């Protein structure tokens, strides 16, 4: 038995070509692998592979939040191309916008490629769920979540557990070797035996 709170996590890959079978999706496996290595909590994943259609993306996000996902991560559809509408779909279902997540993702990605400035990742809260738009490439997903520890650049996931605490979700515990979560001392729980 796991002493940590169980958590439902929605993982959504947004891609016209992958959702129509033109090529294999790499986003969902990358997200599931990273989260499984990072979180000590028992996780129920709710994966979705969908096209770049704003109404479909918004409906999928609402469905996952309504199903009890405390965290929903999307990958893909955040660039400037005409079909890239993930941020618009996400903002359309938001109760609160959390712009710091997108700002930090761009800062991390700019360490590697100057075109990261074209990225439009965002984050929002809907009910008691945090929704994060991540980059489309598996390498960039890991970099933005973990940060660049050797350069002293924190990843966005360090703030995710405390954000979820603040909106009434489960207490997420991370493996510090992958990503050390930050919480104020007043928000820390004793470690389960």
Model-found features: residue ranges?
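Non-catalytic beta/alpha edge segments that cap or flank active sites
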Residues: 1-193
């Amino acid at each position: 038995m796991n002493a940590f709170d169980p958590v439902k996590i929605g993982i959504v890959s947004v891609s016209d070509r992958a959702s129509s079978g033109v090529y294999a999706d790499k986003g969902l496996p990358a997200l599931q692998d990273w989260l499984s290595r990072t979180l000590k909590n028992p996780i129920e994943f709710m994966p979705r592979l969908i096209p770049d259609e704003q109404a479909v993306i918004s409906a999928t996000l609402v469905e996952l939040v309504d199903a009890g996902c405390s965290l929903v991560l999307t990958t893909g559809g955040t660039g400037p191309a005409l079909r890239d509408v993930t941020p618009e779909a996400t903002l359309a279902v938001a109760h609160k916008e959390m712009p710091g997540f997108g700002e930090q993702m761009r800062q991390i990605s700019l360490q590697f490629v100057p075109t990261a400035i074209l990225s439009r990742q965002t984050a929002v809260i809907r009910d008691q769920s945090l929704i994060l738009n991540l980059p489309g490439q598996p390498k960039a997903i890991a970099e933005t979540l973990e940060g660049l520890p050797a350069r002293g650049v924190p990843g966005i996931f360090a703030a995710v557990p405390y954000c979820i605490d603040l909106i009434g979700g489960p207490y997420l515990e991370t493996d510090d070797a992958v990503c050390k979560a930050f919480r104020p001392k007043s928000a820390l729980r004793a470690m389960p035996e």
